[in-house]
Amino acid sequence: MSTPTTVYRSLLRQLREMNVIYKTSTLKQKKGFTKTQKDFLVYTKACLRNNKVEQLSKFQEVVAFLKSGNQHELLFNRHHPLANVNELEKVKLAARRVGLESPE
């Protein structure tokens, strides 16, 4: 069984990874956690200090959920590289693919 410390650390790890994965070029995000994530971490820390087994297992499920979401986003971006590209860039890439240069 995991200890509260390992669950909290794995939760931090997944939230940091989520911030890196979901950051896009259009969204200028500061380093660190969002306000919602900070509030969640404060709540998590308070709950894990109680050392209740049912709360610990719920947070383990949250970690598994975040991990699977991060993995899904990585795989989606790998298999659909044009998903986060605007229409003009898609046209330029398609033209370049067939040997044409699109006008500026």
From Swiss-Prot:
Gene Ontology biological process terms, A to Z: mitochondrial proton-transporting ATP synthase complex assembly
Protein name as catalogued: ATP synthase assembly factor fmc1, mitochondrial
Compartment(s): Mitochondrion
Keywords for the protein's UniProt record, in alphabetical order: Mitochondrion, Stress response, Transit peptide
Main location: mitochondrion
Organism whose genome encodes this protein: Schizosaccharomyces pombe (strain 972 / ATCC 24843)
Cross-referenced InterPro entries: Fmc1
Positions in coiled-coil regions: none
Recorded family membership: Belongs to the FMC1 family.
Function summary: Needed for the assembly of the mitochondrial F1-F0 complex at high temperature.
Gene Ontology cellular-component terms listed: mitochondrial matrix
